[in-house]
Amino acid sequence: MKARFYLLIYLCSIFNIASQESKKFDYELLGAIVLDENQLISYKVQFNVEKNNFIEGYSLTDIDGENETKSYIRGYYNDKTDKIQFKESDILYTKSKFLPEEFCFVSFEGKFKSASNKKLLEGKFVGIYDDKDTCATGEIKLVGKSFIKKKIKKVYKKIKKVKRVDSITKESLKPENYLKKFSETKIKSGEKVSVFVYTSRLKIDIWDYGIEDGDIITILQNDKPILENIKVSRRKQSFTLNLDQKENEFKIVTVNSGKLETNTTKLKLYDFRREYEVVASLKEGEAAIINIVRLRVPTKK
């Protein structure tokens, strides 16, 4: 009972996190990884159920933390028995400083009650390194995003009536604003996010994610300016970036943050069938880095 109480508090707390999803999924579940040491790590899965009960989607670990990581998940779900299993593989992006071979991938088996209001998913997991060694064990406990939204609505109704809470705080606590903050990759000043791709040429779209107010940015590749003084507007601007064989560190610098104090530029990167969306939230003179890591296409042995 205690563990469930702490998990509920934790679920509410992880909604102070940034988000936006452009792709729709059959299921979107939020909660935590509970390690055997009783340590909690925020966790999210979103997936579609395909033919033959096959599931495919993404996981997001340590949301808005220093090790935030997005990975593919693949597995199976039987809605008649409620049994579900999936494994993480192939990192899409990470904020972690660990090397790819040092990542601990989740292998999960448990129950998923998709017909219930909570959309409760829970069960055991084993964390596995690339070399198949075990790196962690514990449980995963998740509930549906819509269930949490209902809970937040109830809390918001109470807060809205409290006169001592200012309007800005009330606005940020609106359910639609809370939930809008949950799944996007947001980089702040001095932060670096590593994105893993298989291509040598990367298409990128750039636009103003907030209010159009005259934001101007410059992008440097390995400290050399490649796109200078771009005026960011609500209209998407498309560019193609040629990647070097080894290092591809792209620095986004806010030259002018416009009328508002903070520049919120959204960048969408395309790599074959993959897409990555990153929001750079930077004040004038601040910079953040997107590190593009080129991967080799795996060959069959």
Outline where the language-model segments fall.
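Short, well-structured beta-strand segments within conserved domains
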Residues: 204, 237, 245-256
